[in-house]
Swiss-Prot record:
Residues 523-533 have a biased composition (Basic and acidic residues). The keyword Nucleotide-binding applies. It is found in: Cytoplasm. It comes from the Bacteria. Pfam families: Cpn60_TCP1. Keywords: ATP-binding, Chaperone, Cytoplasm, Isomerase, Nucleotide-binding. GO terms for molecular function: ATP binding; ATP-dependent protein folding chaperone; isomerase activity; unfolded protein binding. Its main location: cytoplasm. The keyword RNA-binding does not apply. One of its GO terms (cellular component) is cytoplasm. Its EC number is 5.6.1.7. The gene is groEL1. It comes from Mycobacterium ulcerans (strain Agy99). This is Chaperonin GroEL 1.
């Protein structure tokens, strides 16, 4: 296919226009008084959302060069969402501010490599300063506070706080749609682990990029599965049962994986294949944990259980399985409570007997997964559109709460970034030339999130930024009440992990745009003339 090429300033300006269009669309959602964006869907009703990454994912621009810029900033939002689960709009407006000011300076003759280096060093310094100023989070109320800020809903915040305090920091919180109008919390037997689906073709919920199976049969296999003849007899029995299938094994590859994928695409058998976590003996032990939770028997050729000879009697079950690209959650496993209890007691005694600190830590992880169970937040609403929006809010709140527990919190509302400018003074003094200018560019960009939070609340962004620059650390604008004060006392806090991810990802993509010298895109296909054009014929 033939290509279109743009060079130098023309390429960078086109990309900047794309960055601007995406950021301008996303920034309206920022802050407690942020607005909604309505997304038309090719099927079903429109989606109404104030979630930055949902808006960003939906944007593709007509001009291919502008679209390059938009896709780069979209990657900032997506990456921040993947790492921290929130902070996508903050990352987007930071990236836009860096690109806008940076390109103006590059056009004026500043060296883009040195400028980018200064921006990178400034981002690292701010990231370290945010970590150093973090307040640890523990306890139901503190977690609820973070979740409330993320979701802008006290009820959701309280539910997430209760869920996290019950299942523990490493526990699993699953979000489901409910058929009722209310949102409620329940605790069930279940387990989660850090492995995702082996093929994106297993995905059933394309918006959330998750594979979800209701009432599946679960096969646990100790070794690799690659041979189709070995797997086929069992697949046929599962297909006859009419239930979906989940396979957890050391690996699933070759013909076996290809067959599962083809069946999923054709919808002849809904299936998901997942690698079992850990290595060696720890993997074998964790499969036994899963066997207790699901009621399955681990298929192990060493113990005389051969895959091609087993039937449905070795299969476990669960009410629901949710698998993303990185995580698996098994909700309401079909195993007997006594079996889970026995497994928990065994793990506790192993922890007591172990001399190795590392072994004790890993056994403790498994114990937390087993004993904690799964907290399920069931989200209900009056309409399909409202339900989707509310479910998104709950998922963001859970992600924010987990991020807060991991690295602590700082004052929210964009003020932590304004106050992090102090960390750049020493760095600025130690650099010279265009690198030092990069630090100045970054310092100026740190005001962007607060500026837009204030603007969306109907205030003058520049005035608010100047005022917050002068208040004590931890103080700032509460955009919900339009007052200034101690933000932590008002419950306006952000997880450090979210803010740091936004800073580092925005800096990374801005440096890419600033140092771009050539942009190459596919030439758009000319619309075909089918010979039926209107040539002024009289009818």
């Amino acid at each position: 296919m033939s290509k279109l090429i743009e060079y130098d300033e023309t390429a960078r300006r086109a990309m900047e226009a794309g960055v601007d269009k995406l950021a301008e669309t996303v920034r309206v959602t920022l802050g407690p008084r942020g607005r909604h964006v309505v997304l038309a869907k090719s099927f079903g009703g429109p989606t109404v959302t104030n979630d930055g990454v949902t808006v960003a994912r939906d944007i593709d621009l007509e001009d291919p060069f502008e679209n390059l810029g938009a896709q780069l900033v979209k990657s900032v939002a997506t990456k921040t969402n993947d790492v921290a689960g929130d902070g996508t709009t903050t990352a987007t407006v930071l990236a836009r501010a860096l690109v806008k000011t940076g390109l103006r300076l590059v056009a004026a003759g500043i060296n883009p490599i040195a400028l980018g280096s200064g921006i990178g060093k400034a981002a690292d310094a701010v990231s370290e300063a945010l970590l150093a100023s973090a307040t640890p989070v523990s306890g139901k109320d503190a977690i609820a506070q973070v979740a409330t800020v993320s979701s802008r809903d006290q009820l959701i915040g309280d539910l997430v706080g209760e869920a996290m305090s019950k299942v523990g920091h490493d526990g699993v919180v699953s979000v489901e749609e409910s058929s009722t109008l209310g949102t409620e919390l329940e605790f069930t037997e279940g387990v989660g682990f850090d492995k995702g689906y082996l093929s994106a073709y297993f995905v059933t919920d394309f918006d959330a990029q998750q594979a979800v199976l209701e009432d599946p049969l679960i096969l646990l296999h100790q070794d690799k599965i690659s041979s189709l003849p070995d797997l086929l007899p069992l697949l046929e029995k599962v297909a006859e049962s009419g239930k979906p299938l989940m396979i957890i094994a050391e690996d699933i590859e070759g013909e076996a994986l290809a067959t599962l994928v083809v069946n999923s695409i054709r919808k002849t058998l809904k299936a998901i294949a997942v690698k079992s976590p850990y290595f060696g003996d720890r993997r074998k032990a964790f499969l036994q944990d899963l066997a207790a939770v699901t009621g399955a028997e681990v298929v192990n050729p060493d113990a005389g259980l051969v895959l091609r000879e087993v039937g449905l009697e070795v299969m476990g079950s669960a009410r629901r399985v949710v698998v993303s690209k990185d995580d698996t959650i098994i909700v309401d496993g079909g195993g007997a409570p006594e079996a889970v209890e026995a497994r928990v007691n065994l793990l506790r005694s192993e922890i007591d007997r172990s001399d190795s600190e590392w072994d004790r830590e890993k056994l403790g992880e498994r114990l937390a997964k087993l004993a904690g169970g799964v907290a399920v937040i069931k989200v209900g609403a009056a309409t399909e559109t409202e339900l989707k929006k509310r479910k998104e809010s709950v998922e963001d709140a859970v992600a924010a709460a987990k991020a807060a527990v991991e690295e602590g919190i700082v004052a929210g509302g964009g003020s932590a970034l304004i106050q992090a400018r102090n960390a750049l003074k020493d760095l600025r003094a130690s650099l010279s030339g265009d690198e030092a200018v990069g630090v100045d560019v970054f310092s100026e960009a740190l005001a962007a999130p607060l500026y837009w939070i204030a603007t969306n609340a109907g205030l003058d962004g520049s005035v608010v930024v100047n005022k917050v620059s002068e208040v004590p650390a931890g103080h700032g604008l509460n955009a919900a009440t339009l007052t200034y004060g101690d933000l932590a006392a008002d419950g306006i806090v952000d997880p450090v992990k979210v803010t740091r991810s936004a800073v580092l990802n925005a800096s990374s993509v801005a440096r890419m745009v600033l140092t771009t010298e050539t942009a190459i895109v596919d030439k758009p296909a000319e619309p075909e003339d089918d010979g039926h054009g209107h040539h002024g014929h009289a009818h």
